[in-house]
Design a protein with these regions (language model features):
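Soluble, non-transmembrane domains of envelope/secretory-pathway proteins that act on or interact
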Residues: 2-11, 42-44, 48-173
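Extended, non-catalytic substrate-recognition/exosite surfaces adjacent to catalytic cores, especially
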Residues: 1-31
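Active-site core of glycosidic bond-cleaving carbohydrate-active enzymes
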Residues: 17-18, 22, 30, 34, ...
C-alpha cells in the first residue's frame, strides 16, 4: 500500500517509576485474578505478565493487550462494521485472550524474537524492578485500613507517602 500520512507520536518519558510500578501492578491483577485470569489457570502462562481485556458495548470488538518485562502483544478480534456483533458471549477474555495466550506461548517456546534486526532472548523468570518509594503493607481485607492483629489480612503495595495510616477500628478489640 501507499503511505498517505506518517504520524510521529509526541512521546516523553514518565519520571515517576513508582507510579508506573503501581499501574503495572494493577494490570498484573487483571491477569492474576481478574478478567484475564484464564491466562494463568486455563492457558498455564506463568511468566510475570500484566494486561487489559476490553469489549465494546455492542460486542463488535474484543481485545486483550498484555505484556511481560520483555514483550508487548495486543490482539483485536472484531468486524469493521460496528453494527455486526461478534456474538453474545464474545468478550476480550473469551475471544481475544485465547489468541494472545497461544501466541505468547509460541513466542516464549521459541526463546527469542527479532526486533529492529536484533535478536531478543526471552526468559520467563525476568521480573519487573520494584523502584524505591514502593512499600508493601498489611491491610484489613474488610476496611482497607492498616491491619490490626485480629484483622483478616491482605497485602497491598503503596507509594510510601500514601500508605494507610489509620488502624482498622472494626477489628481493634
Amino acid at each position: 500500500g501507499q503511505v498517505i500520512k506518517e504520524f510521529i507520536p509526541d512521546s516523553r518519558e514518565i519520571k515517576d517509576e513508582a507510579v508506573v510500578y503501581l499501574l503495572r501492578d494493577m494490570m498484573r491483577s487483571v491477569v492474576d485474578g481478574g478478567t484475564g485470569g484464564s491466562l494463568r489457570w486455563k492457558y498455564k502462562f506463568y511468566a510475570p505478565a500484566a494486561g487489559k481485556t476490553g469489549t465494546t458495548n455492542s460486542k463488535a470488538d474484543a481485545w486483550f493487550v498484555g505484556y511481560t518485562p520483555q514483550l508487548t502483544l495486543g490482539v483485536w478480534v472484531g468486524i469493521d462494521d460496528p453494527s455486526v456483533s461478534l456474538g453474545e458471549k464474545q468478550y476480550g477474555s473469551s475471544a481475544a485472550l485465547p489468541i494472545f495466550a497461544e501466541t505468547i506461548h509460541e513466542i516464549y517456546k521459541n526463546g527469542s524474537y527479532s526486533y529492529l534486526n536484533e535478536s531478543v532472548q526471552l526468559d520467563n523468570k525476568v521480573n519487573w524492578y520494584r523502584p524505591p518509594g514502593i512499600i508493601e503493607v498489611e491491610i484489613c481485607a474488610e476496611t482497607y485500613d492498616k491491619a490490626t492483629p485480629t484483622c483478616p489480612l491482605n497485602r497491598e503495595i503503596y507509594l510510601k507517602d500514601y500508605r494507610p495510616r489509620e488502624s482498622c477500628q472494626k477489628h481493634a478489640n
